[in-house]
Design a protein with these regions (language model features):
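Trp/Phe/Arg-rich N-terminal binding region typifying the photolyase-homology
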Residues: 1-168, 341-342, 387
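C-terminal, helix-dominated tail/subdomain
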Residues: 310-315, 364, 375-429
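Short acidic alpha-helical/loop segments enriched in Asp/Glu that coordinate divalent cations
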Residues: 296-308, 354, 368-375, 388-391
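C-terminal substrate/ligand-recognition segments
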Residues: 292, 297, 321-367
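Glycine/tryptophan-enriched, flexible segments
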Residues: 147-309, 414-429
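Short conserved catalytic/interaction loops centered on acidic-Pro-aromatic/His motifs
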Residues: 112, 130, 165, 366-378, ...
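Helix-loop-helix junctions that connect adjacent transmembrane helices in secondary transporters/permeases
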Residues: 300-330
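Short alpha-helical scaffolding segments that buttress acidic/His motifs in well-ordered protein cores
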Residues: 247-251, 281-294, 339-343, 357-361, ...
Length: 429
């Protein structure tokens, strides 16, 4: 009897999940597994938690949702905690697994873990296969090799849109043959070394983890309200649930896939018509792809102070007082303060806000951009390694910005995007 293990990571869904579909089609029985990686709940070299309370809570909700969905298909989620390179091989031995399926990684730490697991499995004579589950386009479908991907997004976008095709999403399985999977017992946040986040009524949305919540949000934003048709005009908003799609927390944990969203956008366009706004949502998904492919190309460079630039630069020394003012929203700028308080209290911030607080941190406060990126890694409910570090490098002038150092005039930005001070009043009064 052929037994396979599906190692879930940031692909916590049953829709459009190639690892799951492949394992089911090529095996007699499948064991879905999630390993709570203890290294994800440590403190980084910058002094921040690798995973903060907001994202950890969202993750636990997503795991609960995945388990419930798997149970309806005749399976369940087997949860282990520790080092994946220790825990996955243990399960391979216990369940006599011949093959492990997992999503393909691109970032340095994730790749290192993947390699360790692969090495341990090789010693056991167990096969290991990875699938691309996080992008709109498959790397092998791009009109260039990874090493030849253009360093400017516009060049990448134009050629990709012209010469590559987005594959159709995989349908969700209807049945999974599994041995009996023990009931899911999730740790609480205290066991992960975290405090329970306090709910703030001013938050843009009460984000709930899991695929079903993701699909519900997509249905709301597209078919229930047709807000997608005005996305391009409203996406720079800062107050309320619906100025933007807010899909990012679910995309970050893979509760929904870019290809699934794309297919739904196409269905929406067939029903309500295509326009600049419907295109713009896909355009933003392409940015996510771009940063992911850039990570594949440049490997560890996005974690260096000089980023992907060739000239060496001396990193700036940390000013603890300025960092504390930035984190706690007590700087000289009320616009920056409002954004940083929103992030601290809710784990979320608008795209417009993120660009401004990053520019302020790098240019006005003259701090090492990586410290800001590391704080975002802790705090964001929608943290995605490639998007976070890629965007921070971009705004610090050491990433993929063709214009070099990008400087935001914070006062002008506040006047343009928070004209009546509604956002500042919400968070500062």
């Amino acid at each position: 009897m052929k037994s396979a293990l599906v190692w879930f990571k940031t692909d916590l869904r049953i829709q459009d999940n190639e690892t799951l579909v492949k394992a089911i089609s090529k095996s007699d029985q499948v064991i879905p597994v999630y390993c709570i990686d203890e290294s994800h709940f440590t403190t980084t070299s910058y002094g921040f938690q690798k995973t903060g309370s907001f994202r950890a809570q969202f993750l636990l909700e997503a795991l609960q949702d995945l388990d419930e969905q798997l149970r309806t298909l005749g399976s369940g989620l087997l949860l282990v905690k520790g080092k994946p390179e220790v825990e996955i091989p243990k399960l391979v031995k216990a369940y006599r697994i011949q093959k492990v399926y997992a999503k393909r990684e691109v970032a340095f730490e994730e790749l290192a873990t993947e390699k360790k697991v692969q090495t341990a499995l090789f010693k056991l004579g167990c096969d290991f296969e990875t699938c691309s589950t996080s992008t709109l386009y498959h790397a092998e479908d791009l009109p260039f090799s990874i090493k030849d991907i253009p360093e400017v997004f516009t060049n990448f976008r134009k050629k990709t849109e012209k010469d590559a095709e987005i594959r159709a999403p995989f349908a969700a399985p209807t049945r999974i043959s599994s041995p009996e999977i023990p009931s899911l017992v999730l740790p609480d946040l205290a066991e992960l070394g975290l405090e329970k986040p306090i709910t703030d009524s001013r938050a843009v949305l009460p984000f709930v983890g899991g695929e079903r919540a993701a699909i519900q949000r997509l249905k709301h934003y597209l078919f229930d309200t047709q807000l997608l048709s005005t996305y391009k005009e409203t996406r720079n908003g800062m107050v309320g649930a619906d100025y933007s799609s807010k899909f990012s927390p679910w995309l970050g944990l893979g509760c929904i896939s870019p290809r699934y969203i794309y297919a739904e956008v196409q269905r929406y366009e067939a029903q309500f018509g295509a326009n600049d706004s419907t295109y713009w949502l896909v355009f933003e998904l392409l940015w996510r792809d771009y940063f992911r492919f850039m990570f594949k190309k440049h490997k560890t460079k996005y974690f260096l102070y000089e980023g992907i630039k060739t000239e060496k630069v001396l990193s700036k020394s940390l000013n603890e007082k300025l960092l504390s003012q930035w984190i706690n929203g007590t700087t000289n700028s009320d616009f920056i303060n409002a954004n940083m308080i929103e992030l601290k209290q809710t784990g979320f911030m608008s795209n417009r806000g993120r660009q401004n607080v990053a520019s302020y941190f790098c240019n006005e406060l003259q701090q090492d951009w990586r410290i800001g990126a590391a704080y975002f890694e802790q705090q964001l409910i929608d943290y995605d390694v490639s998007s976070n570090w890629g965007n921070w490098a971009y705004l610090a002038g050491v990433g993929n910005d063709p214009r070099g150092h990008r400087y935001f005039n914070i006062e002008k930005q506040a006047a343009d995007y928070d004209k009546n001070k509604a956002f500042r009043k919400l968070w500062l009064e």
